[in-house]
């Protein structure tokens, strides 16, 4: 049982690092929403479980997630948990290891008789040097509108 909302992010990372879709899905209410880093949206615990089972089998089976920073805002029986993460060990479609990723996971938790569970989650990648994306013929292009500083850095 999750006794404090702060523990939601810790339990998510633990389930992720164990590559355990059942433990991860159990952190959510039956009707929870989860939006992943590319905008795929699962609308219940079973969908969240299935998506993560697939991810652990095909993409993230060797991955390791680390919490870098966390902020919790309690709103009575509800809390918003924002957690910055880093991830290593992801595999390419060819099965080769790829570089480190970073992102932010936002969990909205609600306290119930069985402790805290997430009712909603949104996960997003952090893309260094990018402010937004611009839609073009080939899809979305990472874009930065800021003026380069001296030396070409933004």
Where are these regions (language model features)?
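A short, structured loop/turn motif at beta-sheet edges
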Residues: 72-80, 109-117
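Low-complexity, intrinsically disordered terminal/linker segments enriched in charged
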Residues: 111-112, 118-154
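A short hydrophobic beta-strand element
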Residues: 77-89
